[in-house]
Amino acid sequence: MKLLNGTDIAGFIKERHRQQVAGLEHPPKLAIIRSQDNEAGDRYLKMKRAYGQDIGVPVDLYVETAGTILGRIDALNRDRSVTGIIIQLPLSDPDITDKALAAVDPRKDVDGLAPGTNFEAATPKATLWLLAAHNVDLAGHVVVVGQGRLVGKPLADRLVASGHQVTRCDIHTQDLPAATRQADILFTGTGQPGLIKPDMVKAGAVVVDTGAPKGELDPALYDRPDLTITPNPGGVGPMTVAALFDNLLIAAHQSQN
């Protein structure tokens, strides 16, 4: 088994980002908005704040309700000291999610989720960075399980645009195991812990778990020596934080030039 560890790679990227921040006339600032009752993303929120502190970037947190979030986004859009804005999903009121994401200034949408955004979605960007760093060849049949806005859909869209053969699976897929067994490279990002079982993965496959906060791979998959596989935690997660701050630094350079 080959583990696709992202922690060390993210550490190298962090040092590069620290040097880039030191070279800026004004350090960028990141604003994170989350719902009052959303504690599911606290692990990644802590990772983002720690990363920002390590590279010299202030990270401000705003806890909002469905009634206050759009006003907060508008204020942050107009605040010239704020370089990037993240909406920490999920929001407590799903009906406000589309409105909130659409309200973010595309020039500050460093998560890459707003319509017309200037940036590549952070988790797909991180996922492909991780594979490239480990010299994983994306040749072959790619299967993406989950078509959510954070990972599955933008990842599949990017792979298709790059000419890869991609099968998309979601809740409407009738025989998921049959689909995943065709994958040379299998990505999963559904939010369902333990979804992918050993008998759903072909011999020698590459398996990438983007699930958060809990992994989507059955622990027994890590007993298979034939697989190339991401750990969780320590795989895509640290790389996603690095990709997010990479987008923030791009935004900083754009705003200061």
Which stretches of residues belong to each language-model region?
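Short beta-strand elements in bilobed, periplasmic/extracellular small-molecule ligand-binding domains
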Residues: R49-E64, V166-C169
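Short, well-structured alpha-helical segments in soluble
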Residues: I69-R80
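Glycine-rich phosphate/diphosphate-binding loop of Rossmann-like nucleotide-binding domains
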Residues: D37-K46, A121-T210, L217-R224
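Positively charged, low-complexity intrinsically disordered leader regions
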Residues: M1-H26
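Anion-binding alpha/beta catalytic cores of soluble intermediary-metabolism enzymes, centered on
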Residues: L3, G84-D137, G194
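Rossmann-fold NAD(P)-binding glycine/threonine-rich loop
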Residues: D98-D111, V208-Q256
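N-terminal glycine-rich anion-binding loops that anchor highly charged ligand groups
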Residues: V21-A31, S35-Q53
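Short glycine-rich anion-binding loops that position phosphate/pyrophosphate groups of nucleotides
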Residues: I87-P94, L150, G191-G194, P213, ...
